[in-house]
């Protein structure tokens, strides 16, 4: 199965948590059906990306990275690559690369979708493309509390935060954390 086929199957079968997530799911499925290159960075004005929110095993801490280009704290994630076999594999690769944590186990079922504008998404660093929309498919991974991350070239910092004291008030991130915790904590 190709990455495109996996993305279409995953999102077609996914049960959204609420009406907002369902609308995004439908939008992503429509985009995949309309664009054979929807899983590539070249697809404009929108393409799929994959992300992972890393939680401590007790569900009380979240690992975030201070994104080098955006200058904001995010979950791990990025563009899909041709050799990714699935959305979950891409989410795993991105989280491993950006956190430096080996042995991550990523839940293959997405936990959250996020559509957001990115002004710095370029194929050629010297050629601006305008605003590109990332259709982010987010997963969750759990690691032992206190696991030491490593800062990658894509981040200015990587650190643990209490889930009730994250450095953002963006509802999208707060929803991701809530849904991820609901998925992994009893």
Locations of regions flagged by a protein language model:
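NUDIX/MutT-family hydrolases
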Residues: 138-142, 149-179
